[in-house]
């Protein structure tokens, strides 16, 4: 693996050390990202996107309907045809369990909420693990969809 790849032997990022519980934050110490204008020195602020600013009769939020792609943002590991994965996701223990799927979904929605993003896309297997048969796969998807609909 590349020397630029994150180390997974660190106790804070080792997947086997995951201890998140319902209600825990995945992105602690990061509040909602808001518009602060182009002069802001806050790197966690919008400089040009002001959701409520009116442009030609609509708000920026109406014109720019941002969405997050679940697979690329929360499942992708940063690999490409030229190398091994370069990212670890601290909320992802890399198992195909419902518990891990729920954790990924909670991390995604916390992220999107803090950015003010209202839309997302996913494929069925992105959000729910495949089961031993079609009935189990469908049950897994139904369980995760119940969480996604909240």
Predicted regions and their residues:
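N-terminal pre-domain/capping segments
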Residues: 2-150
């Amino acid at each position: 693996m590349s020397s630029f790849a994150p180390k997974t032997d660190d106790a804070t990022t080792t997947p086997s050390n995951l201890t998140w519980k319902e209600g825990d934050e995945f992105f602690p110490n990061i509040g909602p990202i808001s518009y602060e204008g182009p002069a802001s020195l806050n790197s966690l602020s919008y400089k040009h996107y002001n959701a409520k600013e009116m442009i030609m009769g609509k708000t920026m939020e109406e014109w720019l309907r941002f969405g997050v792609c679940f697979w690329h943002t929360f499942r992708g590991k940063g690999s490409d045809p030229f190398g091994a994965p370069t990212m670890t996701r601290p909320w992802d223990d890399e198992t195909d369990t419902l518990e891990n799927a729920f954790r990924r979904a909670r991390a995604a929605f916390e992220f999107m909420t803090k950015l003010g993003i209202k839309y997302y896309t996913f494929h069925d297997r992105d959000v729910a693990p495949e089961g031993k048969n079609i009935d189990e796969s469908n049950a897994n998807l139904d369980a995760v969809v119940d969480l996604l609909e909240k």
